[in-house]
């Protein structure tokens, strides 16, 4: 009888042990992950790449101790930066995107997690080479990045672009970026479907060309005023506004295959959306006044 009782207890323990361990593991995985919200890719000397990430701070003490001046033959990491409460900025330089991300994970020490990624910012210098497609595919396939992360090209240093990026209106940075891109896409001043999976598919397609969002910083000290132009018939960095956010998103970076070949202003993107039937609004200027008209996009059969 005692043996039977012991067997029953042992079976119960074996049944519940995986559940207990599973619950503990989930918490440990979250605690040990470096959740990246924004990522930047810049060209570095000697054919290297510099990857800069803005991530949730998590355990700042362990991150700082791991990232302080760590170096290896495969590349190097720079010191951890805390640009705002709740977020940290880390960067690593290596011969490839994968090595740089691996270096960040090894020295933080936390596993790089791109499931919450909202934007990938690529410097224009790098975007005008053939490296863009392979970088995006590595991020998407190997690190399983969020399919909906928006691809952005900037003429600025991409790392500095995400360093100065901050959420406003009390929103989390991830939510702020999500709302920001939705708003501009509804205004038809950025290309439709500029997300990671769509941009990769367009770059690999023989029938369509890819388009990413074009963005730049504006210090508001030297605004270029273009006579006879509407507010959206410009490129970012020269928009006539006084918003607190230093980064401006307007227009598109156009690609032929994996290589960036040109840009469109916000107004040109709006016209493109109108001609392709993807426009939701149209901004018209009459006697200097702007009028926004919502277009009927639903096709009716007769």
Language-model features, listed with the residues they occupy:
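Short, Lys/Arg-enriched N-terminal segments with co-localized hydrophobic residues
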Residues: 1-5
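Membrane-proximal alpha-helical signals and transmembrane carboxylates
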Residues: 7-302
